[in-house]
């Protein structure tokens, strides 16, 4: 597993000397009342999307964040919890943990509401989390799991599943790629550490989550990320990489398979006021209803000429039914 050592070295260097845009992409910073993000945290934002969403953070959840970076998303999570050890940050790189501790001191100076004790930083491995079973409401990782190869990815997801409470949420952002990558790219340890050559197709990424037992999956965003071109990388063709934001919910697995929301909607436009499929789905006339892919398929299979099923937008924002 030498690629994991390479990854440690890359992020050890990034902790000692912040590298803007090292592996990821510049993301808009949440503008929240009374929240000021120190510049150093922004420079050390090694994520490829956002894992912080207010709808996940009601009722004072206990949050776990794996791969702390410069601490920016930990600070954002703490904004919602504002309690001692309300957010637990785990990282395998000592230098990154130390950098985050220093950054939290700066955050205290800029935010009167924030105390460093709101975040409990721990040395630990994503493959063996120092966290008790069923103790976390919201777990998060940003641009980390794409680095793992198949065996380690399974272990990392299983660990997140283990520590989450029933109905807890794993929120993630990772690069994905729908094209085949050659073995030279796949086996380049530095490119993998830089979140470039470990990207999976969305279907495989989602399957890794459902295989772990997550009964509900929400794909919340999908956007451009990187290009690997033949002039700069060992590839004969242009490779387009996207990033996605996903929530995997520790719901019981339905008998007919997981509920995967990819942004599809059903619209009934018939003569009646509504359509009821007698399976828990009521479509009010001319009102779009968000549905999971499984339900979308079942409605399409009815062959009706008064129900429209949209394509996946990959921007599911809640509501609807499965």
Label every model-predicted segment.
Residues 137-152:
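A short SAM/SAH-binding and catalytic strip from SAM-dependent methyltransferases
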Residues 176-196:
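Short, glycine-/aromatic-enriched active-site segment of Class I SAM-dependent methyltransferases
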Residues 197-212:
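Short alpha-helix
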Residues 59-128:
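Class I SAM-dependent methyltransferase SAM/SAH-binding core
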Residues 212, 218-224, 229-322:
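C-terminal lobe and adjacent flexible extensions of AdoMet/dcAdoMet transferase-like proteins
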């Amino acid at each position: 597993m030498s690629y994991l050592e390479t990854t440690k070295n890359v992020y050890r260097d990034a902790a000692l000397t912040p590298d803007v845009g090292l592996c990821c992409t510049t993301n808009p910073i949440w503008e929240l009342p009374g929240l000021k993000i120190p510049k150093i945290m922004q420079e050390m934002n090694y994520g490829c999307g956002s894992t912080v969403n207010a709808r996940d953070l009601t009722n004072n959840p206990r949050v776990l964040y794996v791969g702390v970076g410069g601490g920016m998303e930990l600070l954002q999570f703490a904004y919602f919890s504002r309690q001692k050890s309300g957010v637990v940050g785990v990282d395998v790189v000592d230098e990154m943990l130390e950098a985050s501790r220093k950054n939290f001191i700066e955050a205290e100076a800029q935010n009167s509401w924030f105390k460093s004790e709101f975040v409990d930083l721990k040395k630990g491995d994503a493959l063996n989390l120092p966290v008790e079973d069923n103790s976390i409401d919201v777990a998060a990782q940003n641009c980390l799991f794409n680095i793992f190869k198949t065996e380690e990815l399974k272990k990392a997801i299983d660990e997140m599943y283990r520590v989450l409470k029933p109905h807890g949420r794993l929120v993630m952002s990772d690069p994905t790629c729908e094209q085949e990558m050659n073995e030279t790219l796949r086996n380049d340890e530095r490119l993998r550490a830089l979140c470039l050559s470990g990207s999976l197709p969305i279907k495989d990424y989602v399957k890794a989550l459902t295989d772990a037992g997550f009964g509900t999956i929400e794909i919340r965003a999908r956007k451009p990320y990187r290009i690997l071109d033949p002039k700069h990388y060992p590839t004969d063709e242009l490779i387009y990489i996207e990033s996605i934001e996903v929530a995997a919910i520790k719901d019981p697995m339905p008998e007919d398979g997981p509920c995967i929301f990819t942004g599809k909607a059903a619209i009934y436009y018939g003569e009646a006021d509504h359509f009821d499929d007698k399976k828990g789905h009521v479509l009010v006339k001319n009102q779009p209803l968000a549905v999971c892919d499984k339900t979308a398929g079942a409605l399409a299979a009815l062959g009706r000429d008064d129900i429209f099923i949209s394509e996946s937008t990959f921007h599911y924002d809640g509501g609807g039914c499965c």
